[in-house]
Amino acid sequence: MIKQPALAQEQYACVYAWLALLFFREVDDEGLIQLQSAEIADWLALLKRQPALAASVALLEQKIAALSLRQDAQLELAADFCGLFLMTDKKSALPYASQYPQQEPGMIKHLLLEAGMEVNDDFKEPADHLAIYLELLSHLHFSLGESFQQRRMNKLRQKTLSSLLEWLPEFTNNCLKHDPYGFYAALSQLLLAIVRFDDGKEDLSIVAVE
């Protein structure tokens, strides 16, 4: 008998990488086409099979469908992104761990060091940006496929998830309060659901039982 995780390591890795990109930069014309593509629909359908993710996925599907009804959808999404993630007023949802008092200062640097990673010089945002956490989780899930690193990477994955969950709920709540059209609010809710779902998997190894 083969016991497998509800989502494979590679599937987690791809989803985290996709979410990292969406929270890092504005959706351009090409990105908008991809959001509305059959490929993304298939990915969301895969996630929707998990009961813990179904409601969040359904909400995001609704918001993606609603984009076709928004005039100048790409420009409107760009404005939403700017207002939420680039402004510093009280109606924003800044994607930096240091903006939330629950987070230990400099934690992401320690996590990256343990993973043997560093922030690329081309990355112009602070190192504690949400996208860095998600790229780290993507890397760790891919690394879980290498058996000689599995125990160490799984432990580091748990530390990263725990660190992220210290401030991600408040970030998500800010998105809900300040995103009038709801795409990024729905995206943040899905992210929070995935991180919590991932955090519930103590051991992502594949175990074969005779």
Curated annotation (Swiss-Prot):
What are the entry keywords? Chaperone, Cytoplasm
Q: InterPro entries in the record, alphabetically?
A: Chaperone_TorD, DMSO/NO3_reduct_chaperone, HscB_C_sf, TorD-like_sf, TorD/DmsD_chaperones
GO biological process: one example: protein folding
Major location category of this protein: cytoplasm
UniProt keyword Lipid metabolism, yes or no: no
The record's family statement is:
Belongs to the TorD/DmsD family. TorD subfamily.
Task: Describe its function.
Answer: Involved in the biogenesis of TorA. Acts on TorA before the insertion of the molybdenum cofactor and, as a result, probably favors a conformation of the apoenzyme that is competent for acquiring the cofactor.
Protein known as: Chaperone protein TorD
- The record lists the organism as Salmonella dublin (strain CT_02021853)
State the taxonomy lineage.
Answer: Bacteria, Pseudomonadati, Pseudomonadota, Gammaproteobacteria, Enterobacterales
